[in-house]
Amino acid sequence: MLNLRVVYLGTPQFAATVLETLVDARIHVVGVVTRADKPQKRSSKPIASPVKQLALSKNIPLLQPTKTTDPAFLAQLREWQADVFVVVAYGVILKQELLDIPKYGCYNLHAGLLPAYRGAAPIQRCIIAGETLSGNTVIRMDAGMDTGDIANVNHVAIGEDMTAGELAEALAGSGGELILKTLQEIEAGTVRHIPQDSAKATLAPKLTKEEGLVKWDAPASQVYAHIRGVSPAPGAWTRFLSQGKEPRRLGILSARMESSSGSHSPGEVLGVSGEDLLVACRQGVLRLCIVQPEGKVFMKAKDFFNGQSRSVALLF
């Protein structure tokens, strides 16, 4: 058990998984900071973040500031007398005044291999780009966006069918262990701080809903990587045109590669194979498995296709 006093800042499930690893390892988490509760999509009732729910269940003191620059909030942070802050997907760029509070500084777990994929969406962007390797990077934070010196790195292979959601789970699991290793090194005085090579930096900004739009005029492998990269959020979608009707939105929840090929127009629906719908790309064919027509529930792609009175064309 370490003697470090740790304050943890995080918000989504990814961060909750890492926090649980620290709690299970009996790290002395003296306080937790998370974002304010957000209203649910179909209700005005606010919902607590996964990190808040975990902190409450473990009876860990909790703060939810409206602004991280608020003097009263900063004073409360100082009262916790932390040795180190651990930041995991908190969701706000922190100012230097806050970063200077803990004795040994603030350490951030970034779900990507820095300096590549700096930003809010490293997991999604690396899958969309067709990468086969990802990992976590722990940095000692400065006021820049993911620009701090590197303390530790690990690697996670990206499976050929892995979605962003699945990669996030894998990275959260291994990320907790990487933070533990870093805390041990901080206490032992052996932690390293290696400057990033900014010449190799790339950006991974947050994805918009519009970026979920599938562009069929691309190789099937690229289309498949795009669908996996935006799953589960913001989600892949296309437009379908049923004869005599206006174009409508079709969510794509699940897809896979098809071995067959041929000469077809991108976006052309080739028919049903088993439970799936075959769609042509610029090179190759993709199987749509689970889809969601606009305003309807998830369904098998075959059932969607059979429910159309006449021919269907996917627009790209």
Curated annotation (Swiss-Prot):
GO cellular component, one term: cytosol
Binding site for (6S)-5,6,7,8-tetrahydrofolate: G112, L113, L114, P115
Matches recorded under Pfam families: Formyl_trans_C, Formyl_trans_N
Documented EC number(s): 2.1.2.9
Gene Ontology MF terms in the entry: methionyl-tRNA formyltransferase activity
Keyword Transferase attributed: yes
Keywords annotated in UniProt: Protein biosynthesis, Transferase
EC primary class: transferase
InterPro entries in the cross-refs: Fmt, Formyl_trans_C, Formyl_transf_N, Formyl_transf_N_sf, Formyl_transferase-like_C_sf, GART_AS, Met-tRNA-FMT_C, Met-tRNA-FMT_N
Catalytic reactions on record: L-methionyl-tRNA(fMet) + (6R)-10-formyltetrahydrofolate = N-formyl-L-methionyl-tRNA(fMet) + (6S)-5,6,7,8-tetrahydrofolate + H(+)
Family indicated by similarity: Belongs to the Fmt family.
Function recorded in the entry: Attaches a formyl group to the free amino group of methionyl-tRNA(fMet). The formyl group appears to play a dual role in the initiator identity of N-formylmethionyl-tRNA by promoting its recognition by IF2 and preventing the misappropriation of this tRNA by the elongation apparatus.
Protein name (record): Methionyl-tRNA formyltransferase
Highest classification ranks of the organism: Bacteria, Pseudomonadati, Chlamydiota, Chlamydiia, Chlamydiales
